């Protein structure tokens, strides 16, 4: 009886113990994050392609909301903060208004937002990609310009979402190389 109990304990412990080559889910997702990034960016681009024409047709303004200074912040020491703030800006200010522009695009804007939330979650789990504290002046400029545009700001911000994806890609490519 004693040996069968010992055998059961050993079997149980062996099943619970992780294999030596495997880390936690968070560690594994961080290990695979650079390889998964192209797929996440593709998913963002695919989701955006479903609403791009709608918002770009309604965007009648010639100026850019997402300027080169934002890309420079993404590439500089404020890259982490600029990325975190811009994701938050799109999720909390832009997307909720964009969903209300037309019932036919609501589901697609929602899907785009879910893809952006997934990216943010993965970035947060992998601290080396999003370890930040400081505020970005370029993001403040984007937010101020967006607010000044009032109802036209939503069309401007959504019509330039592809630029935002490109900036995310530039930031992540830089971080992966480092």
From Swiss-Prot:
GO BP terms in the entry: immune response; interleukin-10-mediated signaling pathway; negative regulation of B cell proliferation; negative regulation of cytokine production involved in immune response; negative regulation of inflammatory response; negative regulation of interleukin-6 production; negative regulation of membrane protein ectodomain proteolysis; positive regulation of B cell apoptotic process
InterPro entries cross-referenced by the UniProt entry: 4_helix_cytokine-like_core (IPR009079), IL-10 (IPR000098), IL-10/19/20/24/26 (IPR020443), IL-10_CS (IPR020423)
Molecular functions per Gene Ontology: cytokine activity
Compartment(s): Secreted
GO cellular component, one term: extracellular space
Disulfide pattern: 30-126, 80-132
Pfam families: IL10
Main location: secreted
Glycosylated position list: 134
Superkingdom of source: Eukaryota
Signal sequence, start to end: 1-18
Keywords: Cytokine, Disulfide bond, Glycoprotein, Secreted, Signal
Sequence similarity: Belongs to the IL-10 family.
Function, in words: Major immune regulatory cytokine that acts on many cells of the immune system where it has profound anti-inflammatory functions, limiting excessive tissue disruption caused by inflammation. Mechanistically, IL10 binds to its heterotetrameric receptor comprising IL10RA and IL10RB leading to JAK1 and STAT2-mediated phosphorylation of STAT3. In turn, STAT3 translocates to the nucleus where it drives expression of anti-inflammatory mediators.
Subunit comment: Homodimer. Interacts with IL10RA and IL10RB.
Name of the protein described by the UniProt record: Interleukin-10
Originating species: Pan troglodytes (Chimpanzee)
Upper taxonomic lineage: Eukaryota, Metazoa, Chordata, Craniata, Vertebrata
Name of the gene: IL10
